UniProtKB/Swiss-Prot annotation:
Species annotation: Ricinus communis (Castor bean)
Family: Belongs to the Casparian strip membrane proteins (CASP) family.
Transmembrane segments: 7-27, 53-73, 80-100, 131-151
Quaternary structure (record): Homodimer and heterodimers.
Protein name listed in UniProt: CASP-like protein 1C1
Principal cellular location given in the protein's record: membrane
Membrane-related topology note: Multi-pass membrane protein
Length: 163
């Protein structure tokens, strides 16, 4: 049973690692140029602070997820890992929220502010941003499941002990 728990945890951490890595790479490589009559323009992730934040958070989560893969199952650091999982789950949530807000404005524009949508002019860029957001959502769901499972496995023996 303990081996099955370890395998399940490793599988979830591998999925979280992979999806966070994909999200960071896809967003960091999102770039497209275009022109409208004689005006040239360029869309890249680094033009938007929310997208930069998204890449940084997913890069940090990727490194953390990779390092957590090598933590021995008997280690007392797992309680600290649970706290860190909570922090990183919140960071991923905030980075996705910020990036989705900016992506929505890029896709639909904002008629009240006079902002025009840009996805018609730079569809490849918008597709890459959408792909990065999809990978990050999978990472977030995986982290939420991992967090609940970790809390259950670490705290359950403590709750069942007789005092």
């Amino acid at each position: 049973m303990a081996k099955a728990k370890r395998v399940f945890t490793l599988l979830l951490r591998l999925i979280a690692f992979g999806t966070a890595l994909v999200a960071a790479i896809v967003m960091a490589t999102s770039h497209e140029s275009g022109s409208f009559f004689t005006v040239s323009y360029e869309a890249k992730y680094s033009d938007t602070p929310a997208f930069k934040y998204f890449v940084i958070v997913n890069a940090i989560v990727t490194v953390y997820s990779f390092l957590a893969l090598f933590l021995p199952s008997e280690s007392l650091l797992w309680r600290l890992v649970i706290v860190t999982d909570v922090v990183f789950t919140m960071l991923v949530t905030s980075s996705i929220s910020a990036a989705v807000a900016v992506a929505q404005v890029g896709k639909k524009g904002n008629s009240h502010a006079g902002w025009l949508p840009i996805c018609g002019q730079v569809p490849k860029f918008c597709d890459q941003v959408t792909g990065a957001l999809a990978a990050a959502f999978i990472s977030l769901i995986t982290y939420a499941i991992l967090l609940l499972y970790s809390i259950h496995t670490v705290l359950n023996p403590l709750l069942l002990q007789k005092t």
